Amino acid sequence: ALGEGRFAADDFLREIQGLSAHFDVLRIDGVDYRHRGVPKAPPALTDAQVAARVAATPGATLDDFDAVCEHLARVHPSKYARLVEGVPLVGLTGVHQLTSQDVALRLVVLVDRLYDNDVPVAASGESLGAIFTPEMLKGGYRKKYFRSLSRLAALAEMANS
């Protein structure tokens, strides 16, 4: 389980229960704006559309999604910024839902670097909005995954404009 072995859970629980004895719980009704959802990713492009966008953008890259994921496994995440440095557009073909959390988390770091550098992403295959499994979106890294989905939607919109 997430966090297992990192701290003394029994001690933590005892301290939290001790603190909670000094507080009252108040229910506040209304819209919870933290759960507004993720911006919807634009529809996936065709391989030909991605290739055309890459061809029209000098210095752009065109790669197969699985090949990118395999490459990320061989590069330390601290070096991902170098991978996208100076790249005006990333074209990805064959995008599909990821089932491995390791691969998904590496992709999250890459998306962060793309977003930090304002590198648009043109993608074919499945929608970028479906890249993470429902289980991933409910798990311990859900905030990272939702941030990544939001950023992917923004980068895909940039590629479409």
List each model region and its residues.
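Conserved P-loop
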Residues: 45-59, 66-69, 119, 126, ...
